[in-house]
């Protein structure tokens, strides 16, 4: 089994440095362009089926990548983004950022001391649900020889890859930065064991990176 795990394309909230979490924000024009370029780059890669977070930005990314293919695409709640509760919608960029942004930014800068709001998820809860998804598909004999697209989000994708690496740490959750929009990581699952083959593949060109919405 080969997984192609992709982070969704850009949204307006990504561009504005607003906290998304499970708030359902669609792709913007640039995000769709990234997904289209990724689809073009992956056109020679066979894909048998896909799983997507039900959130619009991930689902639309998967639909664009799989356009023109007769491939089933299944909603999978376990790979949706972590919930940030009342922090969702916070503006975290610039001098006029929201007062709570400092507490939220510990999620990225000081993860071991990040305290989620009462109505949010913890990192261990994220590890558990994304791990449940990974364990289930790894054990399915009907998927053993399939190529599978998995369309998800920055933190959810990181939790999946951390589990594959054997890292379930909260303090060291972020190995690097958040995966870029529409970056693709290739994972092989064989005899129930997963390994990362290629990480952070980008299929869009440098000129597309610089393209901006009007």
PLM segments and residue spans:
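Extreme N-terminal starter segment of soluble prokaryotic enzymes
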Residues: 1-4
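Active-site metal-binding loops of divalent metal-dependent hydrolases
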Residues: 9, 154, 200-202
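Active-site-proximal alpha-helix that buttresses catalytic centers in soluble enzyme cores
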Residues: 10-69, 75
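Glycine-rich phosphate-binding loop signature in dinucleotide/nucleotide-binding domains
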Residues: 44-46, 137-146
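Short beta-strand scaffold positions
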Residues: 52-53, 128, 151-152
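Phosphate-handling substructures
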Residues: 68-129, 198
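Acidic, low-complexity terminal tails and accessory targeting/binding regions
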Residues: 75, 82-96, 143-146, 162-214
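GST superfamily/GST-like fold recognition
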Residues: 154-158, 183
